[in-house]
Amino acid sequence: MIEAARRLPRKVFLPYPDAKKLAEDPFPALQSWLTEIERSNRGQRFLLCLDEYERLDEVVKATNSRAPLNFIRNLLQHHQKWILLFSGSRELSELEDYWSDYLINTRALRMTYLQESEARDLISNPVENFTNIYELTAVNEIIRLTRCQPFLVQLVCYELVELLNGDIRRNQGNADTVKATAQNVEEIIPQVLEVGVQYFRELWRSLAESDRNLLRRLIQGETPTPQDKGVVRKLVRKEILTVEGDAFQVPLVQKYVEQVLEEE
């Protein structure tokens, strides 16, 4: 990372951190390193991205120390040149109460589905001058299966391209005339669930047992009861169930849950 930063067109000089101090007490060492970066790149601002930020909760519990969160709070309060971007699958309301003490100056932004027009454009024109490889029925089926969830749209499209390329190689077909069909989309669903297993598994793992029980009952054909109101509200907010609470928002997610239940 350090060498790559120095090769950027707009060069960023990242000093090497003290490996010994990092091993002994990592978070104070990281604070010192970030200060060194500021001194070495005067006049610049920095974006620090923390993906799956909720994993820090596991570190706090495993070490019985809130050092990671103290590090974040220190950075937010005392390093104005740094912008922190947290991303994850859990809302702040789902984390332990003490998190709010450390993220006072943050702002929450919900990342949701693409607009259908945006998803269609992503499918048909992912890069400039992309050859049209989809029949309209295939595009419609991708939209239906993913409900325009951006990661799933791209995952399905990637697997479709792999399928078409494999067919072209095996049958010596013409790449300019081969197009994906709705049937092709259905064919790759098992592969999509396998390749995207980390996404689906994390989604399932983030659910409480009461959430999972309701999904099991829905798969079995039952409908929510008044006692399920709180769980339904939560699963709607997490974009798993529709507002009526009796159907999945994303068919691919439903297929994964069905697969999980079959394996139980």
Question: What function would you assign to each model-found segment?
Answer:
Residues Q149, V192-L193, A208, I240-E264:
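Short capping/hinge segments at domain boundaries that bridge a core fold to an adjacent linker or tail
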Residues K21-S32, A67, E141, L155, ...:
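Amphipathic alpha-helical interaction segments
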